[in-house]
Amino acid sequence: MCIRDRANIACGLLPHVNFMDKITAYSTLRFIAGIGLAGELGAGITLVAESLPKELRAIGTSIVAGFGLLGAVVANFTVELSGDWTVAYFIGGAMGIMLLIFRIGVAESGIFKEVSDDKTLSKGNFISFFTSKERFIKYLKCIAIGLPTWFCIGILAFLANEFSDELNLSGKLNPGKAIMWAYIGISAGDFLSGIISQWLKSRKKAIFWMLVFTIIGVLLMLFSSYTSPSMYYFYCVWLGLGTGYWAMFVTVGAEQFGTNIRATAATTIPNMVRGMLIPMNFLFYYIISSSSSKVIAAVVVGVIAFSLAIYSTLTISETHNKDLDFIE
């Protein structure tokens, strides 16, 4: 947290930096902030999952992630209302410091305390995901479930301006707005995913039907007839709502593994998914260079991402109401 918040505040001071290239400085600071942020969601989800009764885990983790992902929306509005992008970094850094102060008073879960007291038990061992075939396959499936979220955010929203001409829209798309609307949908979807999971009494069914909902949105975004950029932003909300199972996906990852490596799973799985955006982007641009069609490129990448996610969702073990008091 300290690393992330200091890097954010430093980003707000960049206009006053004259001793080095501002782009290099910004890239370096965002990398540092990313390191500080990388494990926060997974650690928070793990703490909530281990602290709440199993009947309330889905609701609790969804609320945590739902409010957390609203940060991207608040940041965009902060810039628009203040007219100065540096203000968003100052506010974000200050809020992070406040969160750090609140975090000091949060107690560890009883399950974790029992494991941490056992000096003979291996804890937080990342290599352990690769020492067992069953555990490794389970780890890969957890990663695959999250791929559609970053396909929608990293390609359809972040690269929205790439699709303006091919979709014959009446105006240019703004990637910043596309991301903002997508995150509004994701935040709402995160809240809903917990409710849907409780209603269906299944993590797998909740994620599966949200994936189906997202696929419909992707097809409408890329193939339906419309000319207004506003409709593209509407579909960004749709895709965000569908891929709002992000909290549920991290929760499933946490629930799959024992207490001694649960936090490691919950922090590394979402980061592995984010990292998979690199090969997805590479494939996207490679197909464009071959076919010149951005829509076809998006469809190919999307088919791969959604196929892997659906297969993994259907074949991974159900964790609804699972007792988390176990070790690997």
Residue ranges and their predicted role:
Residues 56-80, 95, 267-281:
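Glycine-rich segments within core transmembrane alpha-helices of 12-TM secondary carriers
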Residues 135-189, 277-281:
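Extracytoplasmic gate region of multi-pass secondary transporters
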Residues 190-202:
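Helix-to-loop junctions at the C-terminal end of transmembrane segments
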Residues 204-248:
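C-terminal transmembrane helical hairpin of 12-TM major facilitator-type secondary transporters
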